[in-house]
Amino acid sequence: MTTSIDAQYEQYLNAGLTLDLTRGKPCSDQLDLSCALEDMIGGNFKTTDGIDARNYGGLLGIPEARALGGTLLDVDPKYIMAGGNSSLTLMYQFLVWRLKAWQANNPSQTFKFICVVPGYDRHFTICEHLGIEMLSVGFDNAGPNMTEIEALVRQDQNIKGIWCVPKHSNPTGHTYSEATVKRLANLPNLASKDFVLMWDNAYAAHDLDPQTMRHQTGQRSCRQGVL
């Protein structure tokens, strides 16, 4: 039996449409805004450490890009790695690397991640693809429900991390409070070992209100012995 929805679906399939519904992808007009950037450097492609940026570079990335990242994130550039234009690729590669280490000690164990919901579906797709079990935790006014998260981390040594979008979290728009950020930074101290915070600060520079809170950085938490 064919329903009207099935018929409508088949109609779209047969229309031969080639639509790109990728979220967050700039249009050509937006990309054209960056055309003048190459002209600004006047053909000088040498980085501050003397590498020709058109050639292969070091593993940590272009120094100028790392310095810019340090400014944007309020982190010492020596703690910054500048990759390609896909942060999601870096996150995936990092978790593949960590998962291999976890599995080396417990090859038959299923590892878990805390996922603050609603959240970014592609974070969750990475977990699904890697066979990482997802534990959903909701929000309160200050961000993720930290009481529930802390209890989970204390109880289960197979919980290895948490996904965080600390500012203007999509789709709810939550910005984590300073107290919540500090409690998140302390989670590795509550876990059995090797707990990671996947800190996807994608909207760090997207404040519409100039009074939006600046977070204490992970680097500062490290220096305080929290992480």
Feature map (PLM): residue ranges:
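PLP-dependent aminotransferase class I/II
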Residues: L227
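N-terminal "arm"/small-domain region of PLP-dependent enzymes with the aminotransferase-like
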Residues: M1-L60, E64-A65, G70-T71
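Generic enzyme active-site microenvironment
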Residues: M198-W199
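Conserved core of the PLP fold type I
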Residues: I51-K193, A204-Q224
